[in-house]
């Protein structure tokens, strides 16, 4: 009961203080508070990140697969001035059945997203991923709230607009729409108590039948990953209201000495036929 009253009090106080703000001013304030809660400069100056843990895929709300996962992310310098739609990240994703499969020196099945292209790399060579998969990666990245806060703030034409406050999972939240020059919008729920992102939601088109897809993500169990930088250790992804993926992280390390070659194809690697 005390927790509920505290939540109601926070929600009420946020409403009183917000009456003098425009929706744009309130949206900017909420986003600025989120950046500060994520670590401020520790978050904004994050050069790279390595997330390890377990992932569970689901179909019809039932677990359909499990793997151990090591996800490497490195950020590229932002253009000055910022460019709309700039994809400033390279990603290496290694998965396996057991922890030793994702040890760096033993990784023999990885996915690379680098310089606008994607590849599945195995002992046979590098197979370019289909245009649809690469485009889905780009869409997911540009709509990810952590990428937006790290790489897209200040982008020309980016509009941050508050939709007010509400409750989500019995906690008071601030809801903000972030819209770019392509009129693509991400709706983000920020926890009023912690100021951290709790949920995000956006829509995209199915590349096969052009139907509208709702993509939602939930973020929980934030921890300090170094220097005051915060990161969620539980991430759930839903599509059209159904759970499709859950990630349970066991460790997150930032600002490591990751070689650039980790995110590029070896010069002598055989290039296989592209996926359809």
Language model segments and positions:
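Bacterial N-terminal signal peptides
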Residues: 5-14
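Bacterial Sec-dependent signal peptides at the C-terminal "C-region" and cleavage site
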Residues: 14-24
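Gly/Pro-enriched, hydrophobic low-complexity segments
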Residues: 20, 165, 169-266
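N-terminal mature ectodomain segment of secretory-pathway/periplasmic proteins
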Residues: 22-23, 27-126, 159-161
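Short, solvent-exposed aromatic-acidic interface loops
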Residues: 92-97, 124-125, 202-206, 237-243, ...
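Acidic/charged, solvent-exposed loop-and-adjacent secondary-structure segments enriched in E/D, K/R, S/T
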Residues: 119-146
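Short, conserved active-site entrance elements at the starts or edges of catalytic domains
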Residues: 137-177, 198-201
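Gram-negative outer-membrane assembly/targeting C-terminal domains
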Residues: 264-276
């Amino acid at each position: 009961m005390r927790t509920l009253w505290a939540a109601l009090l926070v929600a009420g106080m946020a409403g009183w203080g917000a009456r003098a703000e425009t929706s744009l001013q309130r949206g900017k304030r909420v986003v600025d508070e989120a950046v500060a809660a994520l670590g401020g400069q520790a978050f904004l100056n994050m050069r790279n990140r390595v997330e390890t843990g377990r992932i569970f895929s689901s179909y019809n709300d039932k677990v359909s697969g499990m793997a151990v996962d090591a996800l490497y992310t490195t950020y590229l310098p932002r253009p000055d001035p910022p460019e709309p739609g700039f994809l400033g990240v390279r990603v290496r994703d290694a998965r396996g059945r057991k922890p030793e499969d994702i040890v760096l020196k033993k990784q023999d099945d990885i996915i690379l997203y680098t310089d606008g292209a994607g590849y599945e790399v195995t002992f046979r060579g590098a197979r370019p991923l289909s245009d649809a998969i690469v485009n889905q990666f780009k869409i997911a990245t540009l709509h990810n709230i952590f990428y937006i806060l790290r790489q897209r703030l200040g982008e020309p034409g980016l509009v941050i607009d508050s939709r007010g406050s509400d409750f989500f999972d019995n906690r008071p939240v601030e809801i903000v729409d972030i819209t770019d020059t392509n009129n693509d919008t991400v709706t983000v729920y920020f926890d009023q108590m912690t100021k951290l992102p709790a949920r995000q939601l956006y829509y995209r088109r199915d590349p096969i039948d052009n139907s509208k897809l709702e993509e939602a993500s939930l973020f929980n169990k934030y921890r300090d990953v170094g220097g005051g930088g915060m990161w969620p250790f539980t991430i759930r992804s839903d599509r059209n209201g159904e759970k499709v993926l859950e990630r349970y992280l066991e460790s997150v390390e930032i600002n490591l000495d990751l070689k650039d070659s980790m995110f590029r194809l070896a010069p002598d690697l055989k290039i296989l036929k592209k996926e359809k």
